[in-house]
Regions:
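FAD-binding core/adjacent interface of flavoenzyme oxidoreductases
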Residues: 1-5, 71-137, 213-215, 239-247
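Beta1-alpha1 glycine-rich phosphate/pyrophosphate-binding loop at the start
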Residues: 2-55, 63, 137-171
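Hydrophobic/aromatic ligand-binding patch that stacks against planar heteroaromatic rings
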Residues: 15, 19-20, 99, 154-155, ...
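Short glycine-/acidic-enriched loop or helix-start segments at secondary-structure transitions
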Residues: 16, 39, 110-112, 135, ...
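FAD-site-proximal beta/loop scaffold in flavoenzymes
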Residues: 106, 111, 117-133, 218-262, ...
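A Rossmann-like FAD-binding core segment of flavoenzymes
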Residues: 58-59, 64-88, 94-96, 157-239, ...
């Protein structure tokens, strides 16, 4: 049995693992991929480093490997809590005394013609990172959930216009205060068109929308599914945690994008550090009680 199992091998999860391991805890990291960070072409707002998201993620993983923290490239399918935690993946079962949910936000890439072609050429995955590049221009957000609204709100502060492209979905609801700032377009998308950069969106009814930038914001935090099933509090599609990054379930922590707030590498690393140090205290206190 591990002291802590960390679900997610992004900045939050790796950060927490470094603290846990150096404090003498047995830790296991489980993660299927690097998530949205892998798609970031260049990150220029992280302290001391200008590199691609993938390069930053790989540096963190190397740190964990140097400390001999085991990392399993597996998909978690269920988490059960009964005094201790049982984590089932598509390959194995593991047990731990504490769990950190740090899978970030599962940003789904829709199968739309042109989306791969224009990645980094007008198609982005982070409004806070790249929004300033589109000051006073027409932009769009591709998505239909809370994350899409979050990105649209960020862009509304700098862009000339912001359109949420739901790609045929009609379940998105805006607060009254946002209806004057954000346009909802529920048409199904046929393809993205451009030359060296993206220029327009073509819909299946052959109408077009001139656009200078598109921000992909499909999906919600995958950690939420596990948190909800375990009975953790959820608010606005984010896991509710206290200042210790702990949920209302003893031993269950969450850090990074799945807790909401500023969705940045720097905050994910910080939350992971807090979670890691608090998990250390949790494990030590429980040992003393026994």
């Amino acid at each position: 049995m591990y002291d802590v199992i960390i679900i997610g091998k992004g900045p939050a999860g790796i950060s927490a693992s470094l603290y846990a391991k150096r404090a003498g805890l047995s830790a296991l990291i489980i993660g299927k991929d690097l998530g949205a960070l892998e798609k970031a072409k260049e990150v220029e707002n992280y302290y001391g480093i200008t590199a691609s998201g993938k390069e930053i993620a790989e540096l963190g993983i190397k740190q964990a490997e140097k400390l001999q923290i085991p990392i399993k490239t597996e998909e978690v399918v269920s988490i059960i809590c009964d005094e201790t935690f049982t984590i089932e993946t598509n390959q194995n079962k593991y047990e731990s005394k504490a769990v950190l949910l740090a899978t970030g936000t599962n940003r789904i890439q829709p199968k739309i013609k042109g989306i791969k072609e224009f990645e980094g050429k007008g198609i982005s995955y982070c409004a806070v990172c790249d929004g300033f590049l589109y000051r006073s221009q027409d932009v769009a957000v591709l998505g239909s959930g809370e994350y899409a609204i979050h990105e649209a709100q960020e862009l509304a502060n700098v862009a000339k216009s912001v359109t949420i492209l739901t790609n045929g979905k009609s379940n998105i609801k805006l607060q009254e205060s946002l209806k004057d700032k954000i346009i909802i377009n529920e048409k199904q998308i046929k393809e993205f068109i451009g030359d060296k950069i993206i220029r327009k969106v073509k819909f299946t009814d052959d109408t077009e929308l001139q656009i200078r930038g598109i921000f992909v914001a499909e999906g919600v935090a995958t950690s939420i599914d596990f948190a909800r099933k375990l009975g953790a509090r959820i608010a606005q599609n984010r896991i509710v945690v206290d200042s210790k990054m702990e949920t209302n379930i003893p031993g269950l922590y969450a850090a990074g994008d799945c807790t909401g707030g500023l969705l940045q590498i720097s905050t994910a690393v910080a939350e992971g550090a807090i979670a890691g140090t608090e998990i250390i205290k949790f494990i030590r206190e429980n040992k003393e009680e026994k």
